[in-house]
Amino acid sequence: LPVVEALAAEGFVVSVDTSRPEIMTAAAKAGAKILNDVRGFDLTGAAEAAAATDCGLVVMHGFDAPRGSDIVASVYDYLAKRTTALRELGVSSDRICWDPGFGFGKTVEAILN
């Protein structure tokens, strides 16, 4: 994490993309201001680790939507569920950003529609 420390020391806002709770904790201590999790803070301990920091949290829908499903509803429902889990851990809404995960298991047609 020396790169995070060096960039933060220079005044940059550093975002770390990880799903691992121990990396989230270490990155925040090193000066990261944003944690971005392609799994939506869904791995065991990830939501708790993220909530224990002061970082902004990017909740991403990073996998395929079920075939034949309404992709908008599927993505929305997942992001809402993960946001509820974070809010229940005391994370304020102003720390949470949604990323619908364009390019992760979604066709160009689905993204544009």
Model-derived features: where do they sit?
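N-terminal active-site wall of soluble small-molecule enzyme domains
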Residues: L1-I34, V38-G45
